[in-house]
Amino acid sequence: MLPLHSSESELPTFHSNDELRYAGTCRDRALAEGPGVGLRVRLEPTLERFVDLRHGPQAQQPSEQCGDLLVRDRDGNWTYQFAATVDDYVQGVTLVVRGDDLLASTGRQIQLARLLGRAEPPAFLHHPLIMKSPLQKLSKSDGDTGIRELRERGLTPAQVIERALSLAGV
């Protein structure tokens, strides 16, 4: 783990998938952990290969995509990448099904899981995003209707699945 004190403005823009790539600014600073200091995991410059059940064979080099992986931000919050990887590992998840927008982060989660002790990664399937309009994805965090609400409205499980498949363009 690498403590860091870099601000987002110190990070160069990396033009692959519009991600920011950490340049290693704090790698050699010997910062102590504490308030206002985030944590990163130093990723190895290895190629992560996996087969996505929809997209087929994939190869990603996380250290080139994002640099050292942020796992806890300066406010002390664990990142999605870290929390999802730990949850999947602890719960013994063997199949991760999620949107295409997360395909590019799969290699870093596989490498992080291996660093945490997971011998075999789960299988992955990345599906088209479910859109409520041509430019906006469906999102419960934006107040869009969830499965519970659809079931409360009387839709059967089959109707909910049919609706989701239709919205996903399948």
Task: Describe each model-derived feature in a short phrase.
Residues 118-119, 155, 170:
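Helix N-cap/coil-helix junction residues
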Residues 158-170:
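Generic C-terminus detector
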Residues 1-139, 146-151:
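Active-site cores that bind ATP or allylic diphosphates and position pyrophosphate for catalysis
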